[in-house]
A protein has these predicted regions:
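Non-catalytic interaction-recognition regions
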Residues: 1-226
Length: 226
């Protein structure tokens, strides 16, 4: 490849680096252009978007911007599924698995992001309250979430150095898990301790910001409502 690029007259030929990827199968059937067994990506996107739209119609028929959200979740599900595997591994794509809102998937990550938005919107008058500079005894879920948030720069560097997008997707899933455990075990809006409430709002706000940036790194949109 570098030699071909050099012959084409480009001076960056000696800076090229081959990044190998595994093969892709759909429901166990290997794709191959030589045999004509090809499924276009745009067709996969269309199927995923329609399936998500049907789910949204059933779960929340009065939802606003349903078409935009369905496209973001449907396309994001496929992108996330592909990038969640180590790039050298062969992938068997199963649509139902990719669209599972309860699994280690793009929709699960997007739903978690939407959850942070919902919490902060309900607490809009308090969302920008600064965390008091006092010593607080943290719950385990608060400590775990804080630690997960702090790992973001390190994981991005790992992904860049190894040219491995799955490092970011795995981090996203870890962060979502940490936030959802925190959400289930630590009251936020109903917390009566003002200092703890401010801390929990700050953790939620930080999760929204970092999760949003992480999803953007892998080109997955993050609607505020799903």
């Amino acid at each position: 490849m570098p030699s071909a690029v050099e012959l084409m007259g480009y001076d960056f030929y000696n800076k090229l680096y081959h990044v190998p990827y595994g093969t892709v199968s759909i429901n166990g059937e290997k794709l191959a252009t030589r045999t004509g067994n090809v499924i276009l990506l745009r067709d996969l996107f269309s199927v995923a978007v329609e399936k998500v739209r049907a789910i949204m119609e059933e779960k929340n028929p009065n939802m606003q911007n349903k078409d935009e959200s369905a496209e973001a979740v449907g396309v994001g599900a496929i992108v996330f599924y592909y990038l969640s595997n180590s790039r050298i591994k062969d992938i068997n794509f199963i649509m139902e698995d990719a669209l599972d809102f309860n699994g280690n998937t793009g929709p699960y990550a997007q739903y978690t992001y939407a959850r942070t938005c919902s919490v902060l919107n309900k607490l809009s008058d308090e969302a920008n309250v600064s965390v008091p500079k006092v010593s607080l005894t943290l719950e385990k879920a608060e400590r775990d979430l804080s630690k997960s948030l702090s790992l973001f720069p390190e994981k991005v560097s790992e992904a860049i150095n190894a040219m491995e997008p799955s490092t970011v997707t795995r981090y996203i899933l870890d962060l979502c898990g940490a936030f959802n455990r925190f959400y289930q075990s630590c009251a936020i809006s109903s917390c009566e301790d003002a200092d703890k409430k401010a801390l929990r709002i700050a953790l939620t706000r930080s999760t929204k910001n970092i999760l949003g940036k992480a999803l953007e790194l892998i080109c997955v949109k993050h609607p505020e409502k799903i």
